[in-house]
Amino acid sequence: MKLLNEILGTKYPIIQGGMANIATGEFAAACSNAGALGLIGAGGMRDGDTLRENIRRCKALTDQPFGVNIMLMHPLADEVAKIVVEEGVQVVTTGAGNPGKYIQMWKEAGIKVIPVVAAAVLAKHLEPLGVDAIIAEGTESGGHVGEMTTMALVPQVVDAVNVPVIAAGGIADGRQLAAAFALGACGAQVGTCLLVSEECPIHENYKAALLRAKDSDTIVTGRIGGTPVRVLKNRMSREYVRQEKAGADKMELEKYTLGSLRRAVFEGDTATGSLMAGQVAGMLHEVRPVAAILDELWESGRQRMAALSELC
């Protein structure tokens, strides 16, 4: 099995999650320079020109591979799909939809296509379309989530397809990275553990909330309505879930979520902002450089795998 770094040309077999409103060109470049595949989150861009600017800034700051994450339900998805070709992006990851209508265009441009899935049946459907790899993301992750855990999902996706599988959700240290390889993954995508990096552009209040978090301090909003999102517990998320269980309609619930991610990221509103974070938030204890986080993640994972091999 080829490791992800051999496929992507990165130092480590690790992808930085393309978090909307967070994963800027500068942040992606920092992650790429530190050995991961940095991703720009197109989902948070207000228009195509903003994405172009971020791609160009990333290119100016790194000579390492990087990519763009595209949310296919975004109203600018068609425009973004063309921009990544025009700007010479090397890797595209996709979520929230089927990338089928764009794959031929991307492949002709030499772009590696890696969709994110939350179920093995989706992976099996996407493989014949010509994807290069698949990210199997468990419900432990922050942001939009499915129902299956990473432990259950990854091996089933590995068994369902013949392309490389990347594990995501619940990975913040070497033990979890080693587990991802044991499940059959060729690498991992991480997001929450990078939110507390020095280079991450989120507000300091957001970082402080992450560092205060304990193991049970996340909650999933929108599960009943079909748009589940994992966030830290706060006034907004608790009230959202309470109203959802009481039968509030979509319009009533939108008053809690409209603009809530931007409030958290840019204004540091930890009461009514959407503090997206995975269940590993309770494992975060300090703000460090991206390079320190990734170096330790890989080295501790390598040591864990070596220790496990001695048991056999």
What is each model feature region?
Residues 1-164:
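Active-site entrance/lid segments in N-terminal catalytic domains of soluble metabolic enzymes
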